[in-house]
Amino acid sequence: MLSLAHYLVLGAVLFAISIVGIFLNRKNVIVLLMAIELMLLAVNMNFVAFSHYLGDLAGQVFVFFILTVAAAESAIGLAILVVLFRNLDTINVDDLDSLKG
């Protein structure tokens, strides 16, 4: 049976992969959004692992709230990305530095 340490190590590895993904790829907005979502999922896995280990359901309930916020964040982020691509014909982060009204 897997212990708490196994889940925490897996969560830490996923979190580290997402941080590396953010630092290595700062050009593409889609990859940045995917790395942020992976980071949130790693944190959620740690919440569920601690909740199961302690026998408390509060962590699992908190994960549902985090997942709903993450879904809204990704939907809004992708909607903004579609508008930016239609207006600027690029999803490169370096080209998104002008603020026009």
UniProtKB/Swiss-Prot annotation:
Topology class, membrane: Multi-pass membrane protein
Q: Where are the transmembrane segments?
A: 4-24, 30-50, 61-81
What InterPro entries does this protein map onto? NADH_UbQ_OxRdtase_chain4L/K (IPR001133), NUOK/Mnh_C1-like (IPR039428)
A molecular function annotated in GO for this UniProt entry is:
quinone binding
Top-level EC class as recorded in UniProt: translocase
Tagged with keyword Cell inner membrane: yes
What are the protein's UniProt keywords?
A: Cell inner membrane, Cell membrane, Membrane, NAD, Quinone, Translocase, Transmembrane, Transmembrane helix, Transport, Ubiquinone
User: Where is it found, in Gene Ontology cellular component terms?
Assistant: NADH dehydrogenase complex; plasma membrane
Show the catalytic activity.
a quinone + NADH + 5 H(+)(in) = a quinol + NAD(+) + 4 H(+)(out)
| Biological process per Gene Ontology, one example term | ATP synthesis coupled electron transport
Q: What is its EC number?
A: 7.1.1.-
Keyword Membrane among record annotations? yes
| Annotated localization | Cell inner membrane
Assembly notes:
NDH-1 is composed of 14 different subunits. Subunits NuoA, H, J, K, L, M, N constitute the membrane sector of the complex.
Its annotated function is as follows: NDH-1 shuttles electrons from NADH, via FMN and iron-sulfur (Fe-S) centers, to quinones in the respiratory chain. The immediate electron acceptor for the enzyme in this species is believed to be ubiquinone. Couples the redox reaction to proton translocation (for every two electrons transferred, four hydrogen ions are translocated across the cytoplasmic membrane), and thus conserves the redox energy in a proton gradient.
Please state which protein family the record places this protein in.
Belongs to the complex I subunit 4L family.
Please report the name of this protein according to its UniProt entry: NADH-quinone oxidoreductase subunit K
